[in-house]
UniProtKB/Swiss-Prot annotation:
Gene3D superfamilies associated with the record: Glutaredoxin
GO annotation, cellular component aspect: cytoplasm
Organism, scientific name: Vibrio cholerae serotype O1 (strain ATCC 39315 / El Tor Inaba N16961)
Subcellular location(s) per record: Cytoplasm
A family per Pfam: Glutaredoxin
Entry keyword set: Cytoplasm, Disulfide bond, Electron transport, Redox-active center, Transport
The protein's name: Glutaredoxin
Domain Glutaredoxin: 1-87
GO molecular function: electron transfer activity; glutathione disulfide oxidoreductase activity; protein-disulfide reductase activity
Length: 87
């Protein structure tokens, strides 16, 4: 499983999503992730909207195996249900 987190500096939800990804990477052999700083990479909200296919209001925007999952709360719910994040 590969997760991509699109975030920006100073965003507490981005930090939290990245921390969850670090936890999962440490707990699971089948998990890895990449954090993409949208400011450093020059990615705009419009770029994300094209990829996701709907308006983007907030970051982080998170993909699991190239499928858009949503933001930090959506990622937490998915990881809790499917990956044992809070076990």
């Amino acid at each position: 499983m590969f997760v991509v987190i699109f975030g920006r500096p100073g965003c507490p939800y981005c930090v939290r999503a990245k921390e969850h990804a670090e936890t999962l990477k440490a707990k699971r052999d089948d998990f890895n992730y990449r954090y993409v700083d949208i400011h450093a990479e020059g990615i705009t909200k419009a770029d994300l909207e094209k990829t996701i296919g709907k308006p983007v209001e907030t970051v982080p925007q998170i993909f699991i195996d190239e499928q858009h999952i949503g933001g930090c709360t959506d990622f937490e719910a998915y990881a809790k249900e499917n990956l044992g994040l809070f076990d």
